[in-house]
């Protein structure tokens, strides 16, 4: 926990390869190191993300018809854009999820709270009557699309899937694109091995060319301005989306720019007034631990586990920023947007009227929102010791 090796410590292996495939999912830690060195986003839109949370709900026997797919937009979100999804499964189970845009200006955006509010809608109240939440999960997903894709190749490396922003955010689908990118990478690597290539850029560019000729481009190029349009708000986005639908994704402006999620957050008083936590929109529905949960109750359903004696993998660069600037002005967004109650601002014992940050890192479910959305870029998510994290089953 204090950075000292334990008796069973084993040093990591140094693996060497002719070519490395970065396929770490959203906000990959190794690829971030590489991207800093090679500036793979030069000339691109910055990465932008959405935070998704979902639950698996067991309903009474005979009440659910499997195979329904429902996507909605808007409710219950107010100051942020996003949507919801409802999928019905065999065995009278329902997946209910909510995805919120992290380039929101709202410092009190709380996807977990909004998911609980979603279940108060009369349609879902009827569908989920008598149901009980079995599992919960949360994760960020890259949303910038085609114009936020980094350089895909270099000397001895390529990047695939979510790490390369390969998600169709209109359909909330990315697994098929991740698989296709892996297949493109495998094809390039196989040809390189057969030809005994050194995997210089001339060789790894073959992966880029295969991606350009694949379903990846056709899917992502069609929705290349989708997220950027919706980020402007529901009403403002409607003519933009209509124009894009009529022009194969181009719309009125191509390409539409985006701003890093951390830079879009506004001060709490500017969004919610002098007493933001008293506003009705920021209240959690009554908890019953059956259908409605607080965050700690939901975290239990993830099965997340970390060794209590392991080092904190959530690195806060400057806790004074949290105390003196972020909490007074922004009301500590990390406390709110984290779907797992990792961050708390507790009264400072020796400084009346001030608050200190406490990091409950063993609660972490590895969504990486804190690394993305902190308005001061003050938190870095690092890989935890020994494979700790959520024990997802159906989620």
Regions of interest found by a model, annotated:
Residues 328-362, 369-391:
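Iron-sulfur cluster-binding cysteine motifs and their immediate structural context
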Residues 138-169, 297-311, 322-337, 344:
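FAD-binding beta-loop-beta segment adjacent to the flavin cofactor pocket
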Residues 165-171, 183, 187-235, 351-353, ...:
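Active-site-proximal substrate-binding core of FAD-dependent oxidoreductases
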Residues 153, 159-168, 175-189, 203, ...:
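Extended, hydrophobic alpha-helical segments in both membrane/secreted and soluble proteins
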Residues 44, 106-109, 148-151, 169-177, ...:
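Alpha-helix capping and helix-loop boundary segments enriched in small/acidic/polar residues
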């Amino acid at each position: 926990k204090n950075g000292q090796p334990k008796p069973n410590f084993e040093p990591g292996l140094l693996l060497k390869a002719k070519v490395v495939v970065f396929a770490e999912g959203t906000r990959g830690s190794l690829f971030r190191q590489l991207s800093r060195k090679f500036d793979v986003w030069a000339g691109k839109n910055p990465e932008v993300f959405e935070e998704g949370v979902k639950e698996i709900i067991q309903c009474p026997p005979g009440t659910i018809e499997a195979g329904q797919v429902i996507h909605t937009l808007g409710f219950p979100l107010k100051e942020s854009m996003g949507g919801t999804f409802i999928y019905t499964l065999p065995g009278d189970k329902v997946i209910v999820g909510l995805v919120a845009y992290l380039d929101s200006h709202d410092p009190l955006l709380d996807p977990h709270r909004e998911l609980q509010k979603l279940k108060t809608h009369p349609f879902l109240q009827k569908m989920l009557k008598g149901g009980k939440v079995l599992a919960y999960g949360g994760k960020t997903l890259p949303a910038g699309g085609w114009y936020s894709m980094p350089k895909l190749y270099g000397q001895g490396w390529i990047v695939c899937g979510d790490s390369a922003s390969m998600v169709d955010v209109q359909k909330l689908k990315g697994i098929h694109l991740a698989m296709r990118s892996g297949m493109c990478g495998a094809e390039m690597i196989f040809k390189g091995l057969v030809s005994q290539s050194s995997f210089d850029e001339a060789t790894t560019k073959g992966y880029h060319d295969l991606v350009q000729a694949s379903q990846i481009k056709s899917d992502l190029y069609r929705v290349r301005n989708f997220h950027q349009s919706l980020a402007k708000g529901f009403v403002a986005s409607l003519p933009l989306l209509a124009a894009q639908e009529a022009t194969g994704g181009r719309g009125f402006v191509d390409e539409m720019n985006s701003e890093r999620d951390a830079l879009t957050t506004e001060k709490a008083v500017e969004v919610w007034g002098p007493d933001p936590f008293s506003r009705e929109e920021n209240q959690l529905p009554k908890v019953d631990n059956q259908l409605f949960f607080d965050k700690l109750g939901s975290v239990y359903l993830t099965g997340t586990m970390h060794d209590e004696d392991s080092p904190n993998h959530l690195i806060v660069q400057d806790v004074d920023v949290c105390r003196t600037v972020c909490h007074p002005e922004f009301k500590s967004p990390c406390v709110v947007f984290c779907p797992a109650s990792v961050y708390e601002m507790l009264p400072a014992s020796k400084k009346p009227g001030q608050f200190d940050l406490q990091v409950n890192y063993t609660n972490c479910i590895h969504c990486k929102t804190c690394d993305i959305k902190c308005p001061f870029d003050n938190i870095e998510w690092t890989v935890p010791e020994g494979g700790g994290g959520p024990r997802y089953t159906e989620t």
